[in-house]
């Protein structure tokens, strides 16, 4: 950071302090990860200087011959990773990727079936405060009250009743395998298109550890960070028949110049995901999540749906020990464990309070945490949350966090 330090000491200090926070804390936010130095280097490259409206070989600016190379490589690698017919790597975020699909598949006011946010869905799947809920008529499906898993019979019933033009599958806080084949069958039955938002599970899909939605969906959207371990950004995968509509909706429809430095970083991350050790990493992510869930159950915590099939563990802290999600998040943060409060199915608390917390294993697994480390993480979580007013116990938890993070340093 020598250049930043010379130019802007205040920003340099903030960046350095953020690095120290990441290095000294255990990161359990399920949507976060640590990218490689190669990904960061690509994102901080001279490509940030280049305007490149359009697509490879069809630009509105001169001098795009090299960004054409990096963007084409990103597209080809994404196709190889997921077996997609067409890929657009230009969306700046997952939300913009979702917006583009809606603009292609729907007219304003059309009916869409999407997962309830408090049951594990996402803001862009029809939340009233989001553009999706304002522009379209979203009908919500959720999970079964007893199993806390998606009730496909209920999804089918709602689809038959409301005849949606589009069905959205995918979630931001759902810890079980999603049956895309069933969603496709339901969509076909009511003559709806199927969109899958695989933002949270894209890395698992790439590694073959979760069913691939590309086989079933008309459109698949994703972020490129989270389990995919790339830069913050979005991507759309679709059938060849939708290529022109998707591309013109991204540009010039909702975006101008693409972020070619970010696209180059996406290409680097996709290249990493094509390597054999990426599958090993994803296998460890899932192993660690299962160990974390089981260890917390042994400590007396109720896990939503009773466990996990992926990278994510949803914990009912209110029902387990009487703390709200907000209180649990703040307590864990005080000892060096970063997570987020999260609504759980049929939550009675407000969204900014919640009854649950969402935990994820991708970031800590990138640091090298294994099953034994996550057993210790569960014990530290239990110690802190069960003694949230006991400064001595909280100090013990903090010291145990420091010992773990020292054992698995970041970017060393």
From Swiss-Prot:
Q: Which domain of life is it from?
A: Bacteria
Listed binding positions for (6S)-5,6,7,8-tetrahydrofolate are 117, 121-123
What cofactor does this protein call for?
pyridoxal 5'-phosphate
Q: What class of enzyme is it?
A: transferase
- What reaction gets catalysed by this protein? (6R)-5,10-methylene-5,6,7,8-tetrahydrofolate + glycine + H2O = (6S)-5,6,7,8-tetrahydrofolate + L-serine
Task: Fetch the InterPro entries from UniProt.
Answer: PyrdxlP-dep_Trfase, PyrdxlP-dep_Trfase_major, PyrdxlP-dep_Trfase_small, Ser_HO-MeTrfase, Ser_HO-MeTrfase-like, Ser_HO-MeTrfase_PLP_BS, SHMT-like_dom
Q: Where in the cell is it found?
A: Cytoplasm
GO CC, sorted alphabetically, is: cytosol
Described function: Catalyzes the reversible interconversion of serine and glycine with tetrahydrofolate (THF) serving as the one-carbon carrier. This reaction serves as the major source of one-carbon groups required for the biosynthesis of purines, thymidylate, methionine, and other important biomolecules. Also exhibits THF-independent aldolase activity toward beta-hydroxyamino acids, producing glycine and aldehydes, via a retro-aldol mechanism.
Q: Give the matching HAMAP family.
A: SHMT
What's the protein called, per UniProt? Serine hydroxymethyltransferase
Annotated source species: Staphylococcus aureus (strain COL)
Q: Which gene encodes it?
A: glyA
């Amino acid at each position: 950071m020598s250049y930043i330090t010379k130019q802007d000491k205040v920003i340099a200090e903030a960046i350095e302090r953020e690095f120290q926070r990441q290095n000294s804390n255990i990161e359990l936010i399920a949507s976060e990860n640590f990218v490689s130095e190669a990904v960061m280097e690509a994102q901080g490259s001279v490509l940030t200087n280049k305007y490149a409206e359009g697509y490879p070989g069809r630009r509105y600016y001169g001098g795009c011959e090299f960004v054409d190379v990096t963007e084409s490589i990103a597209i080809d690698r994404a196709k190889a990773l997921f077996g997609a017919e067409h890929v657009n790597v230009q969306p700046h975020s997952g939300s913009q990727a979702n917006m583009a699909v809606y603009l292609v598949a729907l007219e304003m006011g059309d009916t869409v079936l999407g997962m309830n946010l408090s049951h594990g869905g996402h803001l862009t799947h029809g939340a009233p405060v989001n553009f999706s809920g304002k522009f379209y008529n979203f009908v919500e499906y959720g999970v079964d009250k007893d199993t806390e898993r998606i009730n496909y019979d209920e999804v089918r019933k709602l689809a038959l009743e409301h005849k949606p033009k589009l069905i959205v599958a995918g979630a931001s806080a759902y810890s079980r395998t999603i049956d895309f084949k069933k969603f496709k069958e339901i969509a076909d039955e009511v003559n709806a298109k199927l969109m899958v938002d695989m933002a949270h599970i894209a890395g698992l899909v790439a590694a073959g550890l979760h069913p691939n939605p590309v086989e079933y969906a008309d459109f698949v959207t994703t972020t490129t960070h989270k389990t995919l371990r790339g830069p913050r950004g979005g991507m759309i995968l679709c059938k060849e028949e939708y290529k022109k509509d998707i591309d013109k909706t991204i540009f010039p429809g909702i975006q101008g110049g693409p972020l070619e430095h970010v696209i180059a970083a996406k290409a680097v991350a996709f290249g990493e995901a094509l390597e054999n050790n990426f599958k090993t990493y994803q296998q460890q992510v899932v192993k660690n999540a299962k160990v974390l869930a089981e260890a917390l159950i042994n400590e007396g915590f109720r896990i939503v749906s009773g466990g996990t099939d992926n990278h994510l563990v949803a914990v009912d802290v209110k029902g387990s020990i009487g703390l709200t999600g907000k209180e649990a998040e703040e307590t864990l943060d005080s000892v060096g464990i970063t997570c987020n409060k999260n609504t759980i199915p049929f939550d009675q608390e407000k969204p900014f309070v919640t009854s649950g917390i969402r935990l994820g294993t991708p970031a800590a697994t990138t640091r090298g945490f294994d099953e034994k480390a996550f057993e210790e993480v569960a014990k530290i979580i239990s110690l802190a949350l069960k003694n949230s007013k006991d400064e001595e116990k909280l100090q013990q938890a903090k010291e145990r966090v420091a010992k773990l993070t020292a054992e698995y340093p970041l970017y060393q």
